[in-house]
Every structure is written in structure tokens, then in C-alpha cells.
Amino acid sequence: MLGSVKMEAHDLAEWSYYPEAGEVYSPVTPVPTMAPLNSYMTLNPLSSPYPPGGLPASPLPSGPLAPPAPAAPLGPTFPGLGVSGGSSSSGYGAPGPGLVHGKEMPKGYRRPLAHAKPPYSYISLITMAIQQAPGKMLTLSEIYQWIMDLFPYYRENQQRWQNSIRHSLSFNDCFVKVARSPDKPGKGSYWALHPSSGNMFENGCYLRRQKRFKLEEKVKKGGSGAATTTRNGTGSAASTTTPAATVTSPPQPPPPAPEPEAQGGEDVGALDCGSPASSTPYFTGLELPGELKLDAPYNFNHPFSINNLMSEQTPAPPKLDVGFGGYGAEGGEPGVYYQGLYSRSLLNAS
């Protein structure tokens, strides 16, 4: 036990060092905010403004009790105390191009004006191309090429907008197709502006057309065609309505002819209504085909026949003992009563 104590005391006597009073340095207070910064710099070589080899050699002698290097120049290089802050002066801290492209583009980003879609319609583009040509006429392929040379936007999706160009040339009267002359061989016809379509755009501004150009001949032809169709339509309607009117209109009864005095003191009205001879004079002059010939004359004395419904004179109510020849009805049958009733009610309603 004593030996171990002696050995510990011996070790302490050998390894302990007590400096003299003149060799003691003044104490240096460390900066609390820069301590974690220096430790971070030593661990992360990418964010350090110094080469990977470490800090540059200090002019002061390095010793076990040497004061730390001044941290004043490190402040401006790390204003944000971040990974990429203050690294613009060194190539080690600059982010690579992949990091920049990997980020999302800002919301206010727009493509360059040279590649933006021009604010012109297809008719305006065709008009500009034709007016810029020396001969004031261009083929379809030349119009395509002129548009692509002037506006880089139309160098993509060519099939889509070229179809629109063809439709605009075909369905607008302001563009005229000109055949090739023999001295200018080639493929495709020329397209030119109509001579009367010079005022489509106001003061040479192609952003919007002042008015749509239409040929007056087509308008006149369209109006005359509509007029002829209306005339034909009215004429045909009149022609179709005429036979209907003739069919539906009842024949006008002739003035009543004097009839002989009835025998046995019977009423004349009852004889007129009951006898079939009273309706036969109306149709004696008509020559009907064999299919339309009327076999029995009693059909015109039906309670709902045209003669009974449209006659001006209301027949007197017949006696109950008088029957119809064709029907063979007895005197007390209710059909006789309904005949006079319906004829009077329809006449009053009209």
C-alpha cells in the first residue's frame, strides 16, 4: 500500500510542471459565438473558405498555450452562418449547375419574348406575308417559311398551325388563289389578296381586323336564292292549301225549288228532312269516278254529315212516326232527336 502511494507521488513529481512567474501568459477569453463555427469549419470542408489542407500557417509560434488565431476576418465571409453563405469568393463553396436546375423555377419566370406566341391571328400573318412579298403573292410553302423565319414560336408544332393556315386561306374571301403562269413553273398555286380587301386592317395595325371582308356577289346570290325559295315555298303552300279548301268547303245549296203540296196534310219540313230526294239535287251535276260513286243517297242525311252541320236553315223537328228510309229506324228511336239537337248547337257555336 505504501509502495503504491510512493509510486504515485514519484509519478506526479516527474510529470508535473510548474512554470515560473515570468513564463505565465495572460489569459485569453474565447469568443463563445465563434467556437461552434470553428468546429463546423473543421468538419465541413465544402463550406470552408480555406483549401482542404486546413487553415493557413499562422505567423505566431505555435505552442501548447498559444492564443487562437484572430476571428475578425471570418465574420464577413459568413453573414448568414449557412452552408452557402459567404462562399462566393471561393470555388469550393459555389453550388454546382445541377443544384440550380433541380430547383423549381420562380413563379414570375417567362420565356423570352423572341420565343413567345405572337399576338396575331392567322389571317393577319398571311396578310403580312403576302404584303411583304415583292410580287404581292406567295405560295403556301413560302407563307410557311416566312412565318417561321419571323416568329420562332411557329418552328414547333408545325402540323397544327399549318392546317389552320390552309383553312384560313380556303374559307376567307379576302384571299384569292392565282394560277401559275407558264413562265413560272413549279408546284402549287399562288395566293394573293383580293383587290377590294385593302381596308381590313386599320392604319396597318394587324392586331385586329377592322371589318370582315365578304364578296358582294355571294351576298346577293344568297339573298336572291332565299327570296326564290320563299316565293316557291309560299306558292307551293298556296297550291297545296287550295285543294284542301275545295274539299272541306261544302257546296253552296241552290235556292229551294217549289215543291208540290204534301198529301195528307203532312209537314213540309218533315218531308224535306226525312225524304232522301231532298239531298240528291246537290250532287246530280257532279261526275265522280266509279270508286267514289255514292250508292246510297241516305249517307248525306246522317246527323253528322256536312249538309246537316253546315246548312243555314235549321230543319224543323220531325214527327216521331217518320223514319229514315236507309236506316229503317222506328219512330221512337233517339237518333231523330239527336239529329236536330246537334245541328242547332253547332250552328249557335259558330
From Swiss-Prot:
Which Gene3D superfamilies does this one have? Winged helix-like DNA-binding domain superfamily/Winged helix DNA-binding domain
Q: List this protein's GO terms for biological process.
A: anatomical structure morphogenesis; cell differentiation; cellular response to starvation; chromatin organization; hematopoietic stem cell homeostasis; intracellular glucose homeostasis; positive regulation of transcription by RNA polymerase II; regulation of transcription by RNA polymerase II
DNA-binding region of this protein: 116-207
Q: Which GO terms describe its molecular function?
A: DNA-binding transcription factor activity; DNA-binding transcription factor activity, RNA polymerase II-specific; protein domain specific binding; RNA polymerase II cis-regulatory region sequence-specific DNA binding; sequence-specific double-stranded DNA binding; transcription cis-regulatory region binding
Q: Note the PROSITE patterns from the entry.
A: FORK_HEAD_1 (PS00657), FORK_HEAD_2 (PS00658), FORK_HEAD_3 (PS50039)
Q: Where is the composition biased (Pro residues)?
A: 250-259
Q: Where in the cell is it found?
A: Nucleus
The answer, when asked if Iron is one of the entry's keywords, is no
Identify the tissues in which this protein is expressed: Expressed in erythroleukemia and hepatoma cell lines and in liver and pancreas. Not expressed in any other cell lines or tissues examined.
State where composition is biased (Low complexity). 226-249
The UniProt function text for this chain reads: Transcription factor that is thought to act as a 'pioneer' factor opening the compacted chromatin for other proteins through interactions with nucleosomal core histones and thereby replacing linker histones at target enhancer and/or promoter sites. Originally described as a transcription activator for a number of liver genes such as AFP, albumin, tyrosine aminotransferase, PEPCK, etc. Interacts with the cis-acting regulatory regions of these genes. Involved in glucose homeostasis; binds to and activates transcription from the G6PC1 promoter.
Assembly and binders: Interacts with FOXA2.
The name this protein goes by in its record: Hepatocyte nuclear factor 3-gamma
* Organism listed in the record: Homo sapiens (Human)
Encoding gene per record: FOXA3
